[in-house]
């Protein structure tokens, strides 16, 4: 259980949050020990930890979920996860990935505007809670679900 959620940190601060990247439980523990209030598992860090190279296409959602779960369980500060384009090609798949990450303790999700991957139509704008297709629609579905049902003790993930 986190001392504070990302939502609380954002609401309580009048400054930008410093969110260092972590790649495993040891780096997460180091970030916590030196006093940071939050951390992020980035796609590049995940790829480096899992494959030894910084190439986003070499990791997958299963690896992200596995590493994020281990990190979230090993720390008392909230974890954000960069899921890039979500590794999925449909709104419902993105929705399910967001739900799975929330269930293992991820409290914030960073997602790219994936129009360069052919998921979002050109010119689509990703707005919290709205679906324009692809990632935006899947994440919008997730946010709407989270708002209606709540997401347990960590206040649901934020973007």
PLM region spans:
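Alpha/beta enzyme core
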Residues: 1-159
């Amino acid at each position: 259980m986190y001392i504070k959620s990302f939502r609380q940190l954002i609401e309580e601060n009048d400054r930008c949050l410093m969110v260092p990247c972590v790649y495993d439980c040891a780096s997460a523990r180091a970030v916590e020990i030196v006093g940071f209030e939050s951390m992020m598992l980035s796609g590049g860090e995940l790829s480096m930890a899992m494959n030894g190279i910084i190439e986003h296409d070499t990791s997958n959602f299963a690896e992200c979920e596995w590493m994020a779960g281990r990190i979230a369980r090993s720390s008392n500060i909230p974890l954000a996860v960069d899921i890039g384009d979500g590794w999925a090609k449909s709104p419902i798949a993105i929705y399910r990935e967001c739900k799975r990450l929330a269930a293992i303790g991820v409290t914030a999700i960073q997602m790219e505007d994936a129009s360069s991957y052919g998921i979002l139509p050109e010119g689509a704008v990703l707005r919290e809670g709205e679906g324009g297709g692809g990632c935006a629609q899947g994440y919008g579905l997730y946010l709407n679900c989270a708002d209606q049902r709540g997401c347990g003790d960590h206040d649901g993930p934020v973007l």
